[in-house]
């Protein structure tokens, strides 16, 4: 098989995931796009490992081992990421990443819609630590 | 390199290449739909198609073990987690008009530019490179297991510790503290407690 086929497919998948990360607004959709990017990298690793296992004399099968590691780390990442999104949703009532601007510079809160949950969260945090 | 190019027809694809191309088109289409559809649950279901297509691509590249791990972990576990996340954040069923943010044209520009650059570089670099798919499978369970437990034992064990830490972290993050729970119960009746319901 021509090596360009899997390489081009993985490049296109990666850019699809890149678009999703930049353009999506819901945090879970952003996580799904991150999964697409990780899968593109996995396809690259597998394709080059299969190529090198024929072309090279001695190979550690590092591509497939790294693919397994990437899959495990992606599973850990999606678990932690969803836990964070759920915690944010519980505190703010939204998983919209455009509205999470508390640490952004130069952005005043847009209105009472974003202001009220933020103060509510601060009060909640103070209550939780007390 | 020229010998390799001579022994393979450049524009006469083999059956495996045609199958790879077709499955790749399906995978890419499903991925594009995943990042463009306005229905959140449909995005998760298109993600299943994309990840399953990638598993078929792994099988075509003779990496069997990776393919089955992909089916088990991604299609089995990760997508179920994502669907649960969508349900728990009360994602609306049906079209949600604000799924895309305002900077989607900038995102499209960046994505198309990087896709063009990457495809150009990759095609230019590996124009005369072929993968030999004949002979024993490069990624059978025996081969992968042998290399994993001979050369990659220490990273493997470190990764298991990392998974454990991530699981404990996820549990700690998603556990409700007593104060937060009492607070939520006390204001469950007020409209502010249900504010984020439909969004």
Swiss-Prot record, chain A:
It catalyses: a quinone + NADH + 5 H(+)(in) = a quinol + NAD(+) + 4 H(+)(out). GO terms for molecular function: NADH:ubiquinone reductase (non-electrogenic) activity; quinone binding. Its main location: membrane. Residues 97-130 are annotated as: Disordered. Its EC number is 7.1.1.-. It is found in: Cell membrane. The keyword Cell membrane applies. This is NADH-quinone oxidoreductase subunit K 1.
């Amino acid at each position: 098989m021509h090596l360009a086929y899997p390489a081009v497919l993985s490049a296109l998948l990666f850019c699809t995931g890149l678009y999703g990360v930049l353009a999506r607004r819901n945090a879970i959709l952003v996580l799904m796009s991150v999964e697409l990017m990780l899968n593109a990298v996995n396809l690259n690793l597998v394709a080059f490992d299969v190529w090198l296992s024929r072309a090279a004399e001695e190979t550690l099968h590092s591509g497939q081992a790294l693919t397994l590691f990437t899959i495990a780390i992606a599973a850990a990442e999606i678990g932690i990421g969803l836990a964070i999104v759920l915690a944010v949703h519980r505190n703010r009532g939204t998983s919209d990443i455009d509205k999470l601007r508390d640490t952004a510079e130069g952005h005043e809160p847009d209105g009472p819609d974003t202001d009220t949950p933020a103060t509510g969260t601060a009060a909640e945090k103070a209550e939780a630590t007390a | 390199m020229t010998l390799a190019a001579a022994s393979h027809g450049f524009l006469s694809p083999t059956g495996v290449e045609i199958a790879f191309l077709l499955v790749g088109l399906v995978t890419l289409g499903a991925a594009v739909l995943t990042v463009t559809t306005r229905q959140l649950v449909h995005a998760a279901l298109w993600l299943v198609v994309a990840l399953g297509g990638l598993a078929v691509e792994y099988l075509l590249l003779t990496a069997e073990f990776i393919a089955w791990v992909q089916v088990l972990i991604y299609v089995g576990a990760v997508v179920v987690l994502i669907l649960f996340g969508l349900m728990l954040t009360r994602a609306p069923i049906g079209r949600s008009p604000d799924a895309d943010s305002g900077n989607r044209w900038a995102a499209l520009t960046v994505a198309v530019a990087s896709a063009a650059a990457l495809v150009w570089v990759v095609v230019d670099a590996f124009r005369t490179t072929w993968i030999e798919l004949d002979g024993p499978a490069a990624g059978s369970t025996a081969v992968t297991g042998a290399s994993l437990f001979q050369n990659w034992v220490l990273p493997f064990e470190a990764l298991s510790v990392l998974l454990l830490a991530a699981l404990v972290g996820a549990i700690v993050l998603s556990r409700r503290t007593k104060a937060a729970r009492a607070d939520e119960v006390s204001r469950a009746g007020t409209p502010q407690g249900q504010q984020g319901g439909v969004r």
